[in-house]
């Protein structure tokens, strides 16, 4: 799964259908003549869901016009796109596999609470096996270990409490706004 022909040889672990970096990280290219300076490169996080809110802002449409019967999980990233030294406004991104919350990334740290088992029989996206990682979450520093091979450990790690709190806050949004069955 982490090698050719499924995932290729990349600096990241996993492939499409997993929540490891190789399955979720994709390059993004933004072009807007006269607004976004060409040649700028950034390593900041820009989630796909941010496109909606960012597009609203850039089009001058107020978020107040949106229906209030749903939760909007986006962060306005317009300043990140149009300023030369713009920094990403997203501190964390959550990883889901269907209806299963799998983990979180906050800056350079990533915590897995569940993983997709690549050795599972019938390892296709529809038949993958999800497994809890154990008593303690797997915590990786992606700047040091982009392949997510060596957990940094969970004892006395200052990031673990922050990541756990973020996961709980994110999960709480589903109480007020439960997922809707849209028939897919």
Name each model-derived stretch.
Residues 1-21, 36-138, 142:
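C-terminal cap/loop subdomain of S1 sulfatases and analogous C-terminal strand-loop tails that border
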Residues 28-30:
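Short glycine- and hydrophobic/aromatic-rich loop-to-beta-strand nucleating segment
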Residues 25:
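Conserved nucleotide-sugar donor-binding catalytic segment
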Residues 51, 112-115, 119-121, 128-138, ...:
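Long, internal low-complexity/basic segments
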């Amino acid at each position: 799964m982490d090698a050719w022909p499924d995932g290729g040889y990349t600096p990241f672990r996993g492939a499409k259908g997993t929540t490891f970096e190789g399955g979720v990280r994709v390059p993004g290219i933004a072009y807007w003549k006269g607004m976004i300076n060409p040649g700028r490169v950034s390593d900041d996080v820009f989630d796909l869901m941010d496109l909606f809110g960012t597009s609203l802002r850039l089009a001058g449409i107020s978020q107040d016009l949106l229906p209030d019967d749903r939760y909007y999980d986006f962060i306005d990233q317009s300043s990140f796109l149009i300023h030369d030294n713009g920094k990403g406004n997203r501190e964390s991104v959550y990883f889901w596999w269907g209806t299963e919350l799998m983990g979180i990334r906050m800056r350079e740290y990533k915590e897995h609470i569940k993983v997709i088992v690549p050795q599972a029989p019938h390892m296709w996206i529809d038949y993958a096996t999800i497994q809890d990682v154990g008593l303690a979450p797997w915590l990786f520093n992606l700047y040091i270990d982009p392949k997510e091979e060596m957990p940094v450990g969970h004892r006395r790690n200052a990031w673990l409490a922050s990541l756990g709190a973020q996961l709980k806050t994110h999960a709480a949004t589903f109480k007020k706004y439960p997922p809707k069955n849209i028939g897919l």
